[in-house]
């Protein structure tokens, strides 16, 4: 059974997060909702409130097989600013563990340089954050250990 950590911040796109979490749990994955905000209560970009299972500081990201970054604004910017999360992403990438990002969230990986030389996609308007990437308009693309998705319709 895969262990997935979904990283959450206020202003995330609810469907991108919760649809993915729902499908993964139905498939038998152990999914933990991890807040990077210091609070378990998360408010999505459409003012839907829900609870994270854990705070970032209460978890060990190295225990996860998959790190998942939902999109949405300003949630993506909050994820991008979290140094602990960026360190966990770098470590996971070096270890070849799976990383998935949807909508605006691939911009985090792009700005970290993790997508250079890869094929990736993102929400239209964020392509400039994917420097050194072979950009595609495909809905979902996996290149090596990293999967990126264009947006809500591909959750």
Task: Give the role of each language-model region.
Residues 43-44:
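Acidic surface patches and DE-rich sequence motifs
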Residues 3-6, 12, 23-39, 52-155:
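Active-site-adjacent pocket-lining segments in enzyme domains
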Residues 47:
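Conserved phosphate/oxyanion-binding catalytic-loop motifs
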